[in-house]
Amino acid sequence: MSETITVNCPTCGKTVVWGEISPFRPFCSKRCQLIDLGEWAAEEKRIPSSSDLSESDDWSEEPKQ
């Protein structure tokens, strides 16, 4: 027997079946998938880090020789 696994859409919270029946998983639809992508592109979402890359001593506009 196989159990039906369900998750909540991260955008709208709707229940989504985790399987081939849901091609946009974990999202419920292409719309929710694109909303999430837009939030990442607009930098509304980010992965936390311990330091800011722009303040790093290793960051430079010029390539090292």
From Swiss-Prot:
Cofactor(s) the record lists: Zn(2+)
Q: Which Pfam families match?
A: YacG (PF03884)
Entry keyword set: Metal-binding, Zinc
Transmembrane spans: none
Q: How is the cofactor bound?
A: Binds 1 zinc ion.
UniProt lists compositionally biased (Acidic residues) regions at: 54-65
Q: Which InterPro entries match?
A: DNA_gyrase_inhibitor_YacG, Znf_NHR/GATA
| Single Gene Ontology BP annotation | regulation of DNA-templated transcription
- Record region (Disordered): 44-65
Work out whether the entry's keyword set contains Glycoprotein: no
Q: Which GO terms describe its molecular function?
A: DNA topoisomerase type II (double strand cut, ATP-hydrolyzing) inhibitor activity; zinc ion binding
Residue positions binding Zn(2+): 9, 12, 28, 32
- What family is it from? Belongs to the DNA gyrase inhibitor YacG family.
Q: What does this protein do?
A: Inhibits all the catalytic activities of DNA gyrase by preventing its interaction with DNA. Acts by binding directly to the C-terminal domain of GyrB, which probably disrupts DNA binding by the gyrase.
**Description of how the protein assembles with itself and partners:** Interacts with GyrB.
User: What name goes with this protein?
Assistant: DNA gyrase inhibitor YacG
Recall the taxonomic lineage recorded for the source organism.
Bacteria, Pseudomonadati, Pseudomonadota, Gammaproteobacteria, Enterobacterales
Which gene codes for it? yacG
